[in-house]
């Protein structure tokens, strides 16, 4: 009976296309949230949420982010705490969505961000990741 059902699915061209694309989509994309702190050396040192120029140094951004990372690693509810912190502190427009960037593939983000994101397991947080945009903490959602 299961074999007949699987044969039906495979022999139906539309369903086969849907199944294959679903598998490819799931394998080649991740969904992450992030917390971004910019610094004076960032590509665009302006807080996307306030419109204010960022005045912190890279060293200050790293130090501040290390504090957030330590706090998150001690959290009993990483998902909730990460989203709360990203909403309050991130300097990316994604802060309005708890830092959620949605699904993205290997060609969407800057290379260090992509590499860190695809190495993470679901519900895992990265170490500090530096890109031209600033210093990030990345949380893999899916």
Swiss-Prot record:
It is found in: Secreted; Host cytoplasm; Host nucleus. The keyword Isomerase applies. Its EC number is 5.2.1.8. One of its GO terms (biological process) is symbiont-mediated perturbation of host process. The keyword Isomerase applies. GO terms for cellular component: cytosol; extracellular region; host cell cytoplasm; host cell nucleus; nucleus. One of its GO terms (molecular function) is peptidyl-prolyl cis-trans isomerase activity. Its main location: secreted. Residues 34-142 form the PpiC domain. Peptidyl-prolyl cis/trans isomerase (PPIase) that acts as a key virulence factor by promoting host leukocyte transformation. Binds to and isomerizes specific phosphorylated Ser/Thr-Pro (pSer/Thr-Pro) motifs in a subset of proteins, resulting in conformational changes in the proteins. Promotes host leukocyte transformation by binding to phosphorylated host FBXW7, disrupting dimerization and promoting FBXW7 autoubiquitination and subsequent degradation. Degradation of host FBXW7, leads to stabilization of JUN, which promotes cell transformation. Interacts with host FBXW7; leading to FBXW7 autoubiquitination and subsequent degradation. PIN1 harbors a single amino acid variation in a strain resistant to buparvaquone (AC P0DMT5). This is Peptidyl-prolyl cis-trans isomerase NIMA-interacting 1. It comes from Theileria annulata.
């Amino acid at each position: 009976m299961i074999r007949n059902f699987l044969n039906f699915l495979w022999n139906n061209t539309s369903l086969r296309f849907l199944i294959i694309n679903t598998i490819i989509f799931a394998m080649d994309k991740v969904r992450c949230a992030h917390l971004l702190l910019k610094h004076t050396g960032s590509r665009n040192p302006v807080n996307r949420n306030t419109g204010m120029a960022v005045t912190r140094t890279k060293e200050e951004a790293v130090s501040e982010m290390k504090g957030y990372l330590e706090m998150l690693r001690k959290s009993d509810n990483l998902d909730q705490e990460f989203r709360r912190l990203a909403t309050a502190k991130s300097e990316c427009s994604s802060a309005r969505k708890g830092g959620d960037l949605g699904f993205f593939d290997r060609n969407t983000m800057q290379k260090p961000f992509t590499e860190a994101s695809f190495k993470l397991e679901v519900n895992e947080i990265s170490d500090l990741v530096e890109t031209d945009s600033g210093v990030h903490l990345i949380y893999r959602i899916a």
